[in-house]
Every structure is written in structure tokens, then in C-alpha cells.
Amino acid sequence: MIVSGELPAGERLVEIPTAERLGVSRMPVRMAFRTLEQEGLLSKNEGRGYTVRTVTGEEIAGAVEVRGVLEGLAARQAAERGLDPTTQEALQQCLATGDVLFAKGYVTEEDMEVYHDFNRRFHQVIIEASGNPAISHALARNDHLPFASVSSLAVDRNDMAREYRRFNFAHMQHHAIVDALVNRQGARAEALMREHANATMRYADLFGSPHIDHEGLKVIRDM
């Protein structure tokens, strides 16, 4: 609701009215407020309640750049260690799913739900393959802004042709990354992964624009 613009920046939120608005008890609302505060989407008021924060395109871009560095490091370390058969199979499954998705030459909103799932899995497999838990911890600290992590995906429903080109290109990058990993080309894998993060910079453009069309924006997040 915050990212979609239904709850605009500056709006004050209090537990009871919000719970009544959503038709739920106070406890899940209280927990959601705390989580959103940690993610940087809400700021706690001195008295009661919270206020919806303004998230700038510059903040998103900065967090995405940091993610690229961390995931690039994960890719390099995974390539240098070598991939075990289970990891290779998991990555190949992600590639195969994406190949089928983009083969028809267009994408639907439902397709983007599928993309969100296998893309998140793709990134997680590489992070785990690095064998470096510090990377996961650092990413968790960085993922406090919307779209700083791969757990969130924004789709511009007003221009699905453009979104097809953008995500199809990102999937082609998936193929190149896997090729570098399999061939144990650490420097190449790192460079490709960092460049891959730049595909998310479109979010900084979307949310940094004063003319953002919230109605045309579909946000897909982990449940």
C-alpha cells in the first residue's frame, strides 16, 4: 500500500484505525509497523503511531548499487569455489523456466509473478554457493528500502512491451552469469552480476519521478 501510493508519504498511521481499515486485529498491524520501520518505509512518531516516509530515487539507487557489489562478490567466490551438481541443477532450472517465459515474445502480469519467484531463487542459490554467510548478513542490512533486494519487483503495467525487453535482457544476463560460474571465471562472474543489478535501476527512475503513475504500477513482493 505504501509503495503503490495508496498510503502517500507523510500520512500518519495509528494501530487501531489501520487495523479497522484492513479488517484485522491490532497485533499483525503492530508487527507490520515495526517491520516497515526497520525497512525504512515508516518513521516512528514521538507520540503514538508512525508516519509514511518519503523514499527517494537516490536512496533506491544507492542501495541497489551496494547490492550489486555484494552479489558480485558472491558470484566471484562461487565461481572460484566451483559449483556442485545440485547448485548447477538449481540454476539450470531457473534458466529453463525463464526461457519458456520469454519465448512467446511478450509477458503478462502473471508471467512477472513467475519471474519474481525464479529470479529470487536464482540470486539466492548464488549467494549460498559463495559459502560466505557474511554476504547474506550484509545484504539483509542493505535490503531496508523497497526494491533494494530481489524480493520485490515493480512492473509498469502501462508499458508491458518495455517491461518484456527489460526483463528478457535481465534473463539473458542470467545465462551469461551461469556460464561464467560453470567455467569458474570469477572476475567475469563478478562483473556480470554487478551489471545485472543495474537492471533494477529502473525502480529508481520510477520512484524518483514526480509523475509516477501509481495505478499503473504493480508491485510483487515475497509473501
Question: Predicted regions: what is each one?
Answer:
Residues M1-T86, A134, L206-M223:
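Short linear motifs at protein or domain termini
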